[in-house]
C-alpha cells in the first residue's frame, strides 16, 4: 500500500512523505505506482523550476518507493501562490487515484490539520 503523509501548519502543506508500493500489479506494470510517482515528481520538479519556493528533498529511496520532501518557508507562513496551486493539484490527483482505485492501494493522512 502507498501511504501519503501530508504535514500541515496553519493550513499550509509544508512537507509530504510518500512511501510504499500499491500492490495493484506486478513491478513495472503497476499503474497506481506509476501514476503516483509521476504526479509527485512532476509536482516537485514544477515547483523547483517554475516558482521561487524553497524545496528540500530529505530522502528518496527507489527500493522503498519513498520520497520525503519539505518546503521550509511554508512552515513560517511564507509561500508562493504558484507552489500552492501545484501542491493542491498534486493532492487532488492523489485523492482521485484513491477514489478511483480504493483505499486498499493508497492511504492519505493529513497531519496537523
Residue ranges of predicted features:
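Conserved ATP-binding N-box helix of the HATPase_c
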Residues: 35, 40-47
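N-terminal intrinsically disordered, cationic/polar leader segments
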Residues: 1-31, 45-113
Amino acid at each position: 500500500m502507498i501511504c501519503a503523509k501530508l504535514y500541515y501548519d496553519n493550513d499550509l502543506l509544508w512537507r509530504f512523505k510518500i512511501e510504499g508500493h500499491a500492490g495493484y500489479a506486478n513491478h513495472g506494470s503497476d499503474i497506481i505506482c506509476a501514476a503516483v510517482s509521476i504526479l509527485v515528481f512532476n509536482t516537485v520538479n514544477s515547483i523547483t523550476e517554475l516558482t521561487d519556493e524553497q524545496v528540500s528533498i530529505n530522502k528518496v529511496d527507489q527500493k522503498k518507493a519513498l520520497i520525503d520532501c519539505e518546503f521550509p518557508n511554508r512552515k513560517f507562513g511564507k509561500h508562493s501562490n504558484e507552489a500552492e496551486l501545484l501542491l493542491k493539484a498534486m493532492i487532488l490527483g492523489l485523492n482521485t487515484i484513491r477514489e478511483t482505485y480504493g483505499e486498499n492501494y493508497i492511504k492519505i493522512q493529513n497531519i496537523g490539520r
